[in-house]
């Protein structure tokens, strides 16, 4: 009975998502349906932490979503809410749309309308992991919520108060899915280690956790000692119809052929901006992390038609394009060499409909932003086992390549870079307890931190001062990473603008939420949000986003404007 209900759910979810994309015909692969339903049943009956590994396009999302919806059909409950945890912001928007499509589809099976919410660093109003049956969030937001660092706080009689234990309590009774888990990594392998501790703590408290992935390395899983069952699906999957060719030298704009749906993925924002400005194709767009949200959408609209990339269009970008895109008709990929797991993601962008596609791998201008250890190991693998990249079209060969590159020696070399941060995290976790103030001191789940930069039209509200609206935040926010408060890019930005602001208060006026601002006069230490007037960055920001070359010493401070900030 349970199996039949899960079978029905997986079918309805698959068809609903297909129809939402405007596909001319939608059908369920009957040869996979029974395997998907069986995997969903294993997850439903399991406790603790379970691994779900399957190739891209196998239907992992339907597998781990079905058990949550099945609770309403059975009238038996294991979790009141589901957290879908993504490693990158680029994945959130499409996954939210997907969950909304699913929630609407299951109403036809007799389920109530389930709420889908977002809670992460780019939302205007943080929910602190509360606010929906299904909550879309990031690894950072989940981890810092559990660690009592991202919580609701206020001052009462001169004393700070906060709901420090609320996120941990919500998570301990929840169904948590770590989606695209193979992307949870960094140059010091700090994230996998700290997250492994958090996941096991939550599982021991009663949470059900699914680790969903295509090619997670075994060295990652070793940091989750509480891992229980493993579900590996899709063995013997047919090799994808993508011709991979490794080319000598670095990618030049004139080598990009126009006339078919094409994607170009390079390793740095500066390279993406340069190629975008040089490529001569008629329809072109660029997308990277240092762009306002509305500008990303405007760029994409230039090359999309009916939910697909136009036949004569080129889409250019950075790692932001590796995930979160579901354009089935891309026919050509031009990419720089990157760690093997990134190459797998990039090659996975083309030929998704089964038709023939091509992928060209060029040498990178340098190793940055990736660790030299991984770049060296990937180049060696491309020369030998991967046959110049051709083997990356096979899921099983790709998994073996990931394990070879992320071997114990390589990962140990990465981990030595983050020993101090990991030691701080362990000490913090030992002191952390319910119903008390969080421990003092810093804790990180990755070497880099982020500030939210909002580029918007700053307005004046009489004597109340300058402000921006909630809509301005939604349209104009982006994330800037830093490893220390001496970050040269952020300091250069603050020196080049006449005035920078931070948020001092929030109020509702004229049916809109307003964020009132105060000038950022000196240090940005402790500041999480920086606001800059759009008119003040006209020389630094254009249709291709923030000009990072100027923030790396390529530009001069504007005459007669700005103050030097330390």
From Swiss-Prot:
Top-level EC class: hydrolase
GO cellular component, one term: cytosol
Function comment: CRISPR (clustered regularly interspaced short palindromic repeat), is an adaptive immune system that provides protection against mobile genetic elements (viruses, transposable elements and conjugative plasmids). CRISPR clusters contain sequences complementary to antecedent mobile elements and target invading nucleic acids. CRISPR clusters are transcribed and processed into CRISPR RNA (crRNA). Cas3 plus Cascade participate in CRISPR interference, the third stage of CRISPR immunity. Probably unwinds dsDNA templates, thus providing substrates for CRISPR-associated endonuclease Cas3-HD.
Molecular function GO terms recorded: ATP binding; catalytic activity, acting on DNA; hydrolase activity; nucleic acid binding; RNA helicase activity
Binding site for ATP: 54-61
Keywords, comma-separated and alphabetical: Antiviral defense, ATP-binding, Helicase, Hydrolase, Nucleotide-binding
Organism: Thermoproteus tenax (strain ATCC 35583 / DSM 2078 / JCM 9277 / NBRC 100435 / Kra 1)
Keyword Magnesium listed: no
Keyword Nucleotide-binding attributed: yes
Residue window of motif DEAH box: 179-182
Induction: Repressed by 5 J/m2 ultraviolet light and 50 mM NaCl, slightly induced by 20 J/m2 ultraviolet light, 100 and 150 mM Nacl. Member of the csa5-cas7-cas5a-cas3-cas3'-cas8a2 operon.
InterPro entries: Cas3-like_dom, DEAD/DEAH_box_helicase_dom, DEAD_box_RNA_helicase, Helicase_ATP-bd, Helicase_C-like, Helicase_Cas3_CRISPR-ass_core, P-loop_NTPase
The enzyme's E.C. designation: 3.6.4.-
Protein name, as recorded: CRISPR-associated helicase Cas3
Stated family: Belongs to the CRISPR-associated helicase Cas3 family.
SUPFAM superfamilies associated with the record: P-loop containing nucleoside triphosphate hydrolases
Comment field on protein domains: Proteins of this family have an N-terminal nuclease domain and a C-terminal helicase/ATPase domain. In some CRISPR/Cas systems the domains are swapped, in others they are encoded separately.
């Amino acid at each position: 009975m349970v199996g039949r209900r899960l079978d029905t759910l997986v079918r309805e979810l698959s068809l609903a998502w297909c129809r939402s994309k405007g596909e001319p015909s939608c059908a369920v692969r009957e040869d996979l349906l029974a395997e998907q339903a069986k995997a969903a049943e294993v997850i439903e009956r399991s406790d603790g932490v379970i691994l779900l590994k399957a190739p891209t396009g196998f239907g992992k999302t339907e597998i781990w979503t079905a058990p949550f919806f099945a609770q309403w059909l059975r009238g038996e409950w294991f979790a009141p809410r589901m957290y879908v945890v993504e490693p990158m912001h680029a994945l959130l928007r499409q996954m939210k749309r997907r969950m909304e499509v699913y929630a609407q589809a299951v109403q036809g099976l007799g389920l109530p309308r389930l709420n889908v919410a977002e809670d992460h660093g780019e939302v205007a109003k943080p929910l602190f992991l509360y606010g929906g049956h299904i909550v879309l969030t990031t690894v950072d937001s989940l981890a810092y919520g559990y660690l009592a660092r991202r919580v609701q706080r206020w001052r009462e009689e001169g004393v700070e108060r906060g709901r420090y234990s609320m996120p941990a309590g919500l998570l301990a009774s929840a169904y948590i899915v770590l989606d695209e888990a193979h992307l949870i990594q960094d140059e010091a392998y700090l994230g996998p280690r700290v997250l492994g501790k958090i996941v096991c703590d939550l599982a021991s408290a009663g949470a059900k956790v699914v680790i969903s992935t295509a090619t997670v390395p075994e060295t990652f899983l070793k940091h989750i000692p509480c891992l229980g069952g493993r579900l590996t699906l899709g063995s013997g999957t047919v090799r994808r119809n993508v011709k991979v060719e490794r080319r000598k030298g670095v990618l030049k704009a004139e080598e990009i052929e126009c006339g078919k749906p094409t994607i170009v993925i390079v390793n740095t924002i500066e390279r993406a901006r340069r190629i975008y400005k040089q490529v001569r194709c008629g329809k072109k767009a660029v997308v990277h992390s240092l762009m306002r949200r509305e500008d990303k959408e405007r760029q994409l609209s230039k090359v999309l038609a009916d939910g697909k990339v136009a036949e004569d269009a080129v889409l250019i970008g950075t790692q932001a394009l590796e995930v979160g895109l579901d354009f089935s008709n891309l026919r050509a990929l031009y990419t720089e060499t990157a760690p093997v797991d990134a190459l797998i993601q990039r090659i996975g962008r083309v030929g998704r409909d089964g038709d023939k596609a091509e992928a060209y791998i060029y040498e990178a201008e340098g190793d940055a932003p990736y660790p030299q250890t991984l770049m060296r190991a990937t180049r060696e693998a491309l020369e030998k086992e991967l046959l110049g990249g051709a083997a990356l079209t096979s899921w099983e060969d790709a998994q073996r390549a990931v394990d070879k590159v992320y071997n114990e020696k390589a990962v140990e070399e990465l981990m030595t870079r983050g020993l101090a941060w990991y030691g701080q995290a362990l000490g913090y976790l030992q002191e952390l307890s319910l119903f008390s103030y969080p421990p003092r001191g810093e804790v990180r789940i990755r070497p880099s931190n982020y500030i939210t930069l909002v580029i918007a039209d700053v307005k004046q509200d009489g004597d109340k001062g300058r402000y921006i609206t909630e809509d301005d935040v939604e349209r104009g926010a982006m994330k800037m990473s830093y490893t220390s408060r001496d970050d040269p890019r952020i300091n250069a930005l603050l020196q080049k603008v006449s005035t920078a602001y931070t948020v001092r208060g929030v109020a509702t006026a004229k049916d809109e939420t307003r964020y009132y601002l105060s000038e950022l006069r000196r240090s940005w230490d402790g500041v999480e949000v920086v606001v800059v007037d759009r008119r003040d960055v006209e020389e630094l920001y254009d249709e291709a986003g923030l000009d990072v070359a100027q923030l790396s010493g390529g530009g001069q401070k504007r005459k007669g404007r700005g103050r030097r900030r330390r």
